[in-house]
A protein has these predicted regions:
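Charge-dense, helix-prone N-terminal extensions
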Residues: 1-132
């Protein structure tokens, strides 16, 4: 049995995500939007949907990353984050599969390292789909 998180309803551009972004204005919304755009730009096979109330990026229908805004921070999360390389040690969390990077206006992040994590998660999911 596959342990991938699959969303057959994922589409190229989900208008609900645009509405979510408009509803999260300010610094935190800008942070979430910036990093979700990086996810969107990973490849032509990226699809998206609103899952559990937050923007989720998929390779075809297999979720690889998400953003979520809270009162004081934004999470950039990875569905198989526990299994991807994190040479800069950005990932937080202790779950079996998922990890996240916590961002805020006051808390700097190594943008190149986070971009690398997103690209790694995307490539990892592509490879998992090929292996199925």
């Amino acid at each position: 049995m596959s342990q991938l998180f699959r969303f057959p309803s994922a589409i190229r551009r989900d208008p609900r995500i645009e509405a979510w972004m408009r509803g999260h204005a300010g610094e935190l919304g800008a942070i979430a939007q910036r990093w979700f755009e990086v996810m969107r730009s990973c490849g032509d096979d990226v699809r998206e949907l609103l899952h559990d109330g937050h923007p989720t990026a998929c390779v075809a229908d297999a979720a690889f990353a998400y953003v979520n805004a809270f009162r004081a921070h934004v999470n950039v999360g990875f569905f198989r984050g526990a299994e991807i390389a994190d040479p800069e040690g950005l990932l937080e969390g202790t779950g079996r599969f998922m990890r996240h990077v916590k961002l805020s206006p006051e808390r700097g992040v190594d943008a190149a390292a986070l971009m690398n994590l997103i690209e790694t998660a995307y490539t990892d999911m592509k490879n998992r789909l090929k292996a199925e």
